[in-house]
């Protein structure tokens, strides 16, 4: 444990993967909501990861940093002990792994069960919220027009085809299924939230992987166009609000898709060209047909529970993300006609695709 944190009326909750895109924003929202937060990171000595968290309003009084690693059995036990809630966001992402079964899939699933076991042993955790992924829902031989919580990715298909990021899809799917089974067997209250491609502002200094994909039409990162072909999106703020909503709502149970927009690459490109004429956004996409129909992820279950999305348009979703990237110098303020000379932005270790959640 790095620093102490005072108690709060809302109680103490844990956030895993707290230095990441979603985790850091969730920490901020929980502090704003009045919770005392324990944030886990793999290396508390890494000031570049922890300082943005400790600089958040309320952090001095109600945030503490804890060392924990999904690859180390039992490393979350101390951090979870005494918490009333656990938000599990952390997940290994290594698309270049030479041994994905043992380096990505196994630690993801075993880390999930280790956290579930720690929650059971703590005896104080009233609910666990697991941040899953759209990759647990729609990876299969043939795409359907609509997906919901009843849909599951075909892991055998992923292992056979080995599309870019296949190990991530498999690991998240198996981890979620294992967690749901463990919760049912041991009487734990587990809710899983399934975000689509996450867009929004961010705290960290580097470009979040999901924004490398979401802003590919601006940066000229052509390998990501296939991901944007029929894409579903959620604003980071809406996602974190939904996580807290599901934690606090007594009626919440099971899986919840969290997605507010679906669009084809053509619709997204048209919006970006109109909204940001200073960028050279492509108009044609070789190999992608012009008459695409969107593929929808239904958030009806979440909305029927009473949750309302605040970001109503694509413009609302992208404005803060683009502004933050500009302010941090991660994308240029404009690109010349044709986009010549602009280097694509990539995350460390990234190959041809990046997964949002």
From Swiss-Prot:
Domain of life, source organism: Eukaryota
Organism name: Zea mays
EC identifiers of the protein: 1.1.1.219, 1.1.1.234
Name assigned to this protein: Dihydroflavonol 4-reductase
Catalytic activity: a (2R,3S,4S)-leucoanthocyanidin + NADP(+) = a (2R,3R)-dihydroflavonol + NADPH + H(+); (2S)-flavan-4-ol + NADP(+) = (2S)-flavanone + NADPH + H(+)
Entry function: Bifunctional enzyme involved in flavonoid metabolism.
Enzyme type, top EC level: oxidoreductase
Family statement drawn from the similarity comment of this UniProt entry: Belongs to the NAD(P)-dependent epimerase/dehydratase family. Dihydroflavonol-4-reductase subfamily.
GO biological process: anthocyanin-containing compound biosynthetic process
Chain sites annotated for binding NADP(+): 49, 168
Membrane-spanning intervals of the chain: none
Keywords: Flavonoid biosynthesis, NADP, Oxidoreductase
Family matches, as Pfam families: Epimerase (PF01370)
GO molecular function: dihydrokaempferol 4-reductase activity; flavanone 4-reductase activity; oxidoreductase activity, acting on the CH-OH group of donors, NAD or NADP as acceptor
Pathway, per record: Pigment biosynthesis; anthocyanin biosynthesis
Flavoprotein recorded as keyword: no
């Amino acid at each position: 444990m790095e620093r102490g944190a005072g108690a709060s009326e809302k109680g103490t909750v844990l956030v895993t993967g707290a230095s990441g895109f979603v985790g850091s924003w969730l920490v901020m929202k929980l502090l704003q909501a009045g919770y005392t937060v324990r944030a886990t990171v793999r290396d508390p000595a890494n000031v570049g990861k922890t300082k943005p968290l400790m600089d958040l309003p309320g952090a001095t009084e109600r945030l503490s940093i804890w060392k924990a690693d999904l690859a180390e059995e039992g490393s979350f036990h101390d951090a979870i002990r005494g918490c009333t809630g656990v938000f599990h966001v952390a997940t290994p992402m290594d698309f270049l792994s030479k041994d994905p079964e043992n380096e990505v899939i196994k630690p993801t699933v075993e880390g999930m069960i280790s956290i579930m076991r720690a929650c059971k042993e703590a005896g104080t955790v009233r609910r666990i919220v697991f941040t899953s992924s759209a990759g647990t829902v729609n990876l299969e031989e043939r795409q359907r027009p609509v997906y919901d919580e009843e849909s599951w990715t075909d892991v055998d298909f992923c292992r056979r085809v080995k599309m870019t990021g296949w190990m991530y899809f498999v690991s998240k799917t198996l981890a979620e299924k294992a967690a749901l089974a463990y919760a049912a067997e041991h009487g734990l209250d587990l809710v899983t939230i399934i975000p689509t491609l996450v867009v929004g502002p961010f705290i960290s200094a580097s470009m979040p992987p999901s924004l490398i994909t979401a802003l590919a039409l601006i940066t000229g990162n052509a390998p990501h166009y296939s991901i944007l072909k029929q894409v579903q999106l959620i604003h980071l703020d809406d996602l974190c609000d939904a996580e807290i909503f599901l934690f606090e709502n007594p009626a919440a149970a099971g899986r919840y898709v969290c997605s507010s927009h679906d669009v084809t690459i053509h619709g997204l490109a048209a919006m970006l060209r109109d909204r940001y004429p200073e960028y050279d956004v492509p108009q044609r996409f070789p190999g992608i047909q012009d008459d695409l129909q969107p593929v929808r992820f239904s958030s009806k279950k979440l909305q029927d529970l009473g949750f309302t999305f605040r970001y109503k348009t694509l413009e609302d979703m992208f404005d803060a993300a683009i502004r933050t990237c500009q302010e941090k110098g991660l994308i240029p303020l404009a690109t010349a006609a044709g986009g010549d000379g602009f280097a694509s932005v990539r995350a460390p270790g990234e190959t041809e695709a990046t997964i949002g959640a």
